[in-house]
From Swiss-Prot:
InterPro entries in UniProt: Flu_C_NS2, Flu_NS2
Biological role: Mediates the nuclear export of encapsidated genomic RNAs (ribonucleoproteins, RNPs). Acts as an adapter between viral RNPs complexes and the nuclear export machinery of the cell. Possesses no intrinsic RNA-binding activity, but includes a C-terminal M1-binding domain. This domain is believed to allow recognition of RNPs bound to the protein M1.
Gene Ontology CC, one term: host cell nucleus
Gene that this sequence comes from: NS
Homology family: Belongs to the influenza viruses NEP family.
Protein name per UniProt: Nuclear export protein
Primary location group: virion
Coiled-coil residue spans: none
Native species: Influenza C virus (strain C/Yamagata/1964)
């Protein structure tokens, strides 16, 4: 009977040893996965930061925002001005003139007149781009949430939590902007 007890104890010790070895393998595997996620997240953050929003000054320096005046619109301007003044006189509202004037003088990045771009199409393009930005931010937030799992350094953890908060707030702002455009 004592022989069976020794065998069962040895068997239990063997199983426990194997379980511990397996757990160590899993821990090593998990650590490797976390390290891979960290490096891929850092790479993504570097990629995302290369596309960081630029200031208006930078855009002007790069001549992205150019003022261009189409000569055909200048030729039509006296006629449009007269029509707008007639409408303004008819409605007794001079306030119509200023927004229309500023709208017609506003230049587009695409060098097109505002009147030549349909409002619905422009809204659709803006909404599409905002939704794309939002989806990329959601992917970044997901990757940051995965990276949090294996962080042992408190500074990295604080940085990731801060970046997740920034992502979430930006996503909320973009969604709010999309809703206001709809």
């Amino acid at each position: 009977m004592s022989d069976k007890t020794v065998k069962s104890t040895n068997l239990m010790a063997f199983v426990a040893t194997k379980m511990l070895e397996r757990q160590e393998d899993l821990d090593t595997c998990t650590e490797m996965q976390v390290e891979k996620m960290k490096t891929s997240t850092k790479a993504r953050l570097r990629t995302e930061s290369s596309f960081a929003p630029r200031t208006w000054e930078d855009a002007i320096k790069d001549e992205i925002l150019r003022r261009s005046v189409d000569t055909s619109s200048l030729n039509k301007w006296p006629e449009l001005k007269q029509e707008l003044e007639n409408v303004s006189d008819a409605l007794k509202a001079d306030s119509l003139w200023l927004p229309m004037k500023s709208l017609s003088l506003y230049s587009k990045v695409s060098n097109q007149e505002p009147s030549s771009i349909p409002i619905g199409e422009m809204k659709h393009q803006i909404l599409t781009r905002l939704k794309l930005i939002c989806s990329r931010l959601e992917k970044l937030d997901l990757n940051l949430s995965k990276a949090v799992l294996g962080i042992q350094n408190s500074e990295d953890l604080i940085l990731i939590i801060y970046n997740r908060d920034v992502c979430k707030n930006t996503i909320l702002m973009i969604k709010s902007l999309c809703n206001s455009l709809i």
